[in-house]
Amino acid sequence: MNATVATSVFGVFMAATVALGLLATRGRRKGNGEGGGLAEWSVGGRSLGTAFIWVLMAGEGYTSFSYLGAAGWGYNYGAPVLYVVAYMSCGYAIGYVVGPMLWAYARKHGLVGITDMVAHRFGRPWLGALVAVLATVFLLPYVQLQITGMGVVVSTISYGAISLNWAYFIAFAVTTGFVVVSGLRGSAWVSVLKDVLVIATLGFLAFYVPLHYFDGYGPFLDRLVTEKSEWLTFPGHGDSGLGQAWFITTSFLNSLTVVIFPTTVAGYLGAKNADVLRRNAMLLPAYNVLLFVPMLLGMAALFVVPGLVGAESNLALFKLVVDSLPAWAVGVIGVAAALSSIVPMAVFMLVIGTMWGRSVLSLVPRLERRQKGAAQVVVVIAGSLALLLTYTAPNTLVRLSLISYEAMAQLLPMVLLGLMWRRLTLLGRRRPPRPCRSRWRPARRPS
C-alpha cells in the first residue's frame, strides 16, 4: 500500500513535469532555418530573465547529489563535504566577471556553446570538435551521477518494489524524452517547480528529523560532539586523506572550473542581458545555505541507521525519510529529489547534444542544415552511454562529481585564458605579435 501511494504521487508529478516542459515550448518560433531552431532549443532564444536564470543556475547546485551525495559524504566523512559550499560560492563570485564576458562574446558572434567559442576564438573548427568530444567524455560521469541518484530515489520511494536496474532505466527514459522535446526553456520552467519543492522539503526536514529522532538540535549536536567528534574536523572520519590541503585545492580548482562548465555556460548564454548574470551572481550564494541541511542530516543518520558502507551511504537521508514519514510525504520528497536529477541532467544532455550538433556533426555537409535534429539524436546516444556506465561502473555520487570537475579543469587554459587574453594563440604560437616579441623569447644571436 505504501509503495502504491508513493509511486502514484511520483507518477503524477512526473507527468506534470513533461507537460510543463511541452507548455514552455508552445508557440516558440524556430527562427530562420535549423540553426535558429538550435538556438531556441539550446539557449532558450537568449531571452531568459533574472528569475528563470536564477532557478536554472541554482539547479546546478541542487542535484540528486545534494539530496543523496552530500548526505552520503556527511555520513561517511563529515566536515570535508563542506567543500561543496566553498567552491560554489567562490564560483559565483568568479562568474560575476566571467559570465557577462562569455555572454557578450557569444552574443556578438552568434555562438551557442563553449565549443563554438573555442572554434571561433582560435579560428579552428576542428578544435571546437575536439573540445566537444573531450567535454562529452568528461560530462558523462555527471550524467551517470544524475541517473544513479534518480534511480536510487525511485527504488527507495517504491519501498523496493522497483528494482534499481529498472529505476535507472526510468530515470534515463524520463529525462531523455523531456530534454528532446523541451530544450533549455523547458528545463527553466521545470526548475521553478523543482525549487519550490526543494526549498519546502529541505526546510521541513531540517526541523522534522532532529525533533523526531533527537528531540531537537541541542540533543542532536550534543551527541554529535560527544560521540562523533571526528566528523566535525578535518580530515573527517577515517583515513580519508581529505585534509585542509585537499579542501583548499579542490575548492579553488572547482570554483574556476564551474564557470566554464558547459552547462553553466548554457545558463549564461540563455540570459537576455549581462545584468541578469551579475544579479544572479550576487543572489545565488544565498541559495547555498540549504546545502547544510542534507550534510547535517547525513550525520544524523549515523545514529539512526549505522553501518551503511560504500554506495549505500547515498541512501542515508532517504532511510530517515522512509523510516519516519507517511507514504504520500515520501512521494513528495522523492519528487523533489527526482526533479533535482532531471533538471541538471537535462541541461547536461542538452549541452552534449548542442556541442555535437554545432561543432562536430555540422562539419559533415549533409548535416550542416540539420543541427537541431542531429543534436537530439546525440542526446539519446549520450544518455544511453551514461546508462550503460551506471550498470557497469557504479560509484559513489561525490566521486563521480569530482571525476567530471577534475577532467573539465583540463580545458581551463584554452577556454578561460583564451577569451580573457587576446594575445594568447593556439599552442603558444612561435610568432607572437611584434610588440610582445621580447616577452616571449630572447633575441637570437647573429650567426
Specify the residue positions occupied by each region the protein language model found:
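Membrane-interface "cap" regions at the ends of multi-pass membrane proteins
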Residues: 1-68, 179-182, 201-207, 214, ...
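Selective recognition of specific alpha-helical transmembrane segments in multi-pass small-molecule
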Residues: 11, 16, 130-145, 178, ...
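Hydrophobic alpha-helical segments and their helix-loop junctions in multi-pass secondary transporters
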Residues: 16, 20-31, 99, 139-147, ...
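C-terminal membrane-solvent junction of multi-pass transporters and transport-like membrane proteins
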Residues: 30-51, 403-447
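Helix-loop-helix module between adjacent transmembrane segments
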Residues: 82-180, 250-254, 337-347
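Hydrophobic, small-residue-rich membrane helices and short re-entrant helix-turn-helix hairpins
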Residues: 110-119, 182-193, 260-292, 313-316, ...
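Loop-to-transmembrane helix boundary motifs in multi-pass membrane proteins
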Residues: 121-129, 136, 354-395
